[in-house]
Amino acid sequence: TVEFGQQAKNVEGKNTVVFSSAIKPDNPEIVAAHEAGERIVHRSDILALLMNAKRAVTVAGAHGKTTTSSMLAHILVNAGEGELADPSYAIGGSIQGKDGAILDGGHAGKGNVLVAEADESDGSFAKYHPQIAIITNSEADHLDHYGTQDNYRAAFVDHAGHATKAVIMCGDDEGNLAVLRALDATVAGRTIVYSTRNAAELGDLNGATLVRIESESETAESGAEHFTLHIPGGLIGEEERRIAVTLTVPGIHNARNASAAIIAAALLGMDVERASAAVTSFLGAARRFQVRGTVSQVTVVDDYAHHPTEIAALLDAARRRYPQSKIRVIFQPHLFSRTRFFSSEFAQALAKADDVIVTGIFPAREKQEDFPDVTP
């Protein structure tokens, strides 16, 4: 039963109440559950229990979690066979699937694989012990929780150490390279780095294996993004493999996201060619370069990008997809703390657009009075 509104009566007679970090202690349902002596469990604890019953793949990182986990779920849903078919997934947004079908962000499948976003914002991903951990990047974020960049990256080092089979990391992020070099030798030895850079450019990989991404085009004006994965021998077979991939979602960042999803699918046991073919029909995650429509030659794109790096990647993708068009942005900052921490970086990222309108800040869990130096 779905109840609308937060009311104490909603938890009457319940044995267990599950909450997320977005729910405050003074929430009427949490207060009522405490008073009734009901068991109160954080969402991450439930997700950790579900992972223990499946072959779990987590996707963590400041950017790209939803798209990467959506791509992997899409691959498994459309190309999974046997135990890889009908996966479970817990994703922070709906998926624009094959033939325009919209899949909910959560599904309890009968297969033995679970794909889940691993939220680092509050440190709760420390509870997870997946088979495979994907780390898209570890650029500083959520400093309201971690305090320093070093603390933030240390959390990713810890998370990588919990993966029992493999770690898959993007090597185009300097934060990830710092995390990689801080890994225990055993963990680094089962780590796969995917990157648009070659080994000489990346430097010390601490014993990790490199899968290189080679972009095939300067623009995605045709509506497609083409790239090739160079997979070394010994990773998914004795021979070196060159896998051509075509995406319908633009942007080099999406080539990176798709690379992680394809590698994860291959490590789970899917043929890598089958995985790369399946990702071609992926149309996007909700509010990730989602084209809402075109009126009078004006195309409206909706995107949840709320960190400077995400905004820069979004605008680069827009330039690749629409190289002859003017790019006009309406941007609503998310969180007073993030706006304060990254004000200069936001300005630099938004400068990639031709015109920018900045609206009021969306506070989410924060209160403006706690940030008197930030204009709402």
Q: What are these regions, as identified by a protein language model?
A:
Residues N10-G13, S21-R190, S259, A266, ...:
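Phosphate-binding loop of NTP-binding sites
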Residues K98-D99, D141-Y146, S337-R338, F362-E369:
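A short acidic, helix-capping loop that chelates divalent metal ions and anchors anionic groups
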Residues F346-P376:
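C-terminal helical cap/extension that packs against the catalytic core
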